[in-house]
Amino acid sequence: MSIAICGGGIAGLSTAFYLARLIPKCTIDLYEKGPRLGGWLQSVKIPCADSPTGTVLFEQGPRTLRPAGVAGLANLDLISKLGIEDKLLRISSNSPSAKNRYIYYPDRLNEIPSSILGSIKSIMQPALRPMPLAMMLEPFRKSKRDSTDESVGSFMRRRFGKNVTDRVMSAMINGIYAGDLNDLSMHSSMFGFLAKIEKKYGNITLGLIRALLAREILSPAEKALKAALLAEPKTAELSNSMKSTSMFAFKEGIETITLSIADELKKMPNVKIHLNKPAKTLVPHKTQSLVDVNGQAYEYVVFANSSRNLENLISCPKMETPTSSVYVVNVYYKDPNVLPIRGFGLLIPSCTPNNPNHVLGIVFDSEQNNPENGSKVTVMMGGSAYTKNTSLIPTNPEEAVNNALKALQHTLKISSKPTLTNATLQQNCIPQYRVGHQDNLNSLKSWIEKNMGGRILLTGSWYNGVSIGDCIMNGHSTARKLASLMNSSS
């Protein structure tokens, strides 16, 4: 038995890890087009004489994970099986990083409430002032008669009005997807469950309460996966220990998780990793029960790469999934008191005026992981603005750093000269699920079933969720499905 996995990011690595454990007699070849594994999980340590540790740890992509939900359980299951619990950095639910979050609109910081008292105070802020009336009116708004997909922006405006959508939801979409909420698919976004609640109950405010009481938030597949994960003693134990944890990071950076998976895979005799070796051919084998990848026959192929790459290999229906690019600028100050406020960071909605450098958000990294005992932030710029007008992309890292420092001055009044900076353009890093994404995905899967005998399985951020947790969860589910298929055919 043999399986090929195309793509060495977190989704491909997770799939390989679970497959190798579930089917130890199966040969697994993992193909990665680049020189390293891990995809967008990129932690770098840069030498710095002014840091007590001699280096500064920067994250060039995502940096934290959450323990909550089914995806959170999948994160914890992988961590427990890798045995890297001691490398975690837990962030308490009571910490400033968990409680204090901000939206910058129109020219000031608006604190997002984390308590009832905070909610009372927050309604006087310009970004959140429309919320109370919108929440009161929401149950009385007409629901959508059909179940067709629509944009996140369209859905939210129907249910909560223009101001809440433009000032609050736009900020969230910028932070999660670096995208335009007017283009993003409601059904395929992380808010898709709200559309299901509207369809069943007619509104969100009361419907959400009823759905929570009836435990209807999770799909049957999610409930089954949750039960399977909690049946693992170490996973359940780790989950219980995370009750007061809002999120967690890794002491040596988020790349700890992908490096740990790679180390485990290298120890497994049934796994071979092929770096700098992309899938150049993907065709049905002459026996029609196998698939050829680069001339090698496999019983199944897990495609954990972009739909664009898949479309270049086989004559399948096109997903037409665009992407967002983000300039990530890391900034370190040896002074630990540079930040004027404490918290996780701030997000900027697209309707905020005077945002010429298209800043999406600023993360206060030193609140979460600060071995350097200084002040550390990450400024993220671009997203849909870069997609719509590529001339807005800074032509070099120096320009990006200058833009980021201007944004820090404008939003947080930070004028201090940084000790160390690092700028990285992450091109095409976040897939943008357009309206109709799920229908397109179903069409692609049907084509694979008909023309490739169902021998190709899709996983990763291009198909079923862009977060690390989504990728790990879907990698786990893909491995379980493959194990079931191969066991039933043997």
UniProtKB/Swiss-Prot annotation:
Keywords: FAD, Flavoprotein, Heme biosynthesis, Mitochondrion, Oxidoreductase, Porphyrin biosynthesis. Its cofactor is FAD. One of its GO terms (biological process) is protoporphyrinogen IX biosynthetic process. Pathway: Porphyrin-containing compound metabolism; protoporphyrin-IX biosynthesis; protoporphyrin-IX from protoporphyrinogen-IX: step 1/1. It comes from Schizosaccharomyces pombe (strain 972 / ATCC 24843). The keyword Mitochondrion applies. This is Protoporphyrinogen oxidase. The gene is hem14. GO terms for cellular component: cytosol; mitochondrion; nucleus. Catalyzes the 6-electron oxidation of protoporphyrinogen-IX to form protoporphyrin-IX. It is an enzyme of class 1 (oxidoreductase). Its EC number is 1.3.3.4. Belongs to the protoporphyrinogen/coproporphyrinogen oxidase family. Protoporphyrinogen oxidase subfamily. It is found in: Mitochondrion. Its main location: mitochondrion. GO terms for molecular function: oxygen-dependent protoporphyrinogen oxidase activity.
